[in-house]
């Protein structure tokens, strides 16, 4: 079973991100489940959503405590909440920012992690440019798809199409395509740095 935990704030589409991820996995023939965990339910409050993906029926219903991947929609949570709790050294991390992990003050933390499983994506910037709103979820899911290979960009795009009206979906798919290419380019840089 592959488990994903998504951190963000109310109003950023955290729950929708988990739902779209589960739809994308389902479209690829997997079993999937998505659900949120709310603190105080207000715009701007920290929100966590979870997604599990497996080939077999999923019977677990509790929050994801040992994620295989973490998607962080709001980088201001990095030093306020233990967003990395339970992540294994083999885990994937996708953060919504144009800054590097070092610039975020995470250089020491990531030293024990696999660099090829870490990326940042300027998802809010992409959403503002292509969607006209600061909702980074579609771009981050595409970034996750590029980084992990667990789902395809085509499935992410189809899931976006299922969640949003046509015009909004098209704009989000554009942001997702740009984010996917962004992460692939970042990954090439990591590969060159490791072999160089």
How would you name each of these model-derived features?
Residues 1-196:
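Active-site cofactor/cluster-binding pocket
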């Amino acid at each position: 079973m592959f488990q994903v935990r998504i951190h963000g704030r109310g109003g950023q589409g955290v729950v929708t991100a988990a739902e779209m991820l589960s739809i994308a996995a389902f479209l690829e023939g997997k079993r999937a489940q998505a659900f949120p965990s709310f603190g105080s339910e207000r715009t701007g409050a920290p929100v966590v959503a979870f997604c599990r993906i497996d080939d077999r029926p999923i019977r677990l219903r509790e929050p994801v405590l040992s994620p295989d991947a973490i998607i962080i929609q709001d980088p201001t949570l990095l030093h306020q909440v233990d967003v990395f709790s339970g992540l294994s050294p083999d885990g994937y991390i996708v953060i919504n920012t144009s800054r590097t992990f070092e610039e975020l003050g995470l250089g020491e933390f990531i030293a024990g992690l696999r660099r090829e499983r870490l990326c940042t994506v300027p998802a809010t910037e992409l959403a503002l440019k292509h969607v006209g709103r600061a909702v980074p979820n579609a771009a981050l899911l595409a970034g996750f798809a590029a980084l992990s290979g667990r789902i395809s960009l085509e499935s992410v795009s189809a899931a976006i199409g299922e969640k949003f009206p046509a015009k909004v979906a098209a704009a989000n798919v554009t942001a997702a395509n740009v984010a996917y290419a962004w992460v692939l380019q970042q990954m090439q840089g990591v590969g060159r740095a490791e072999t160089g």
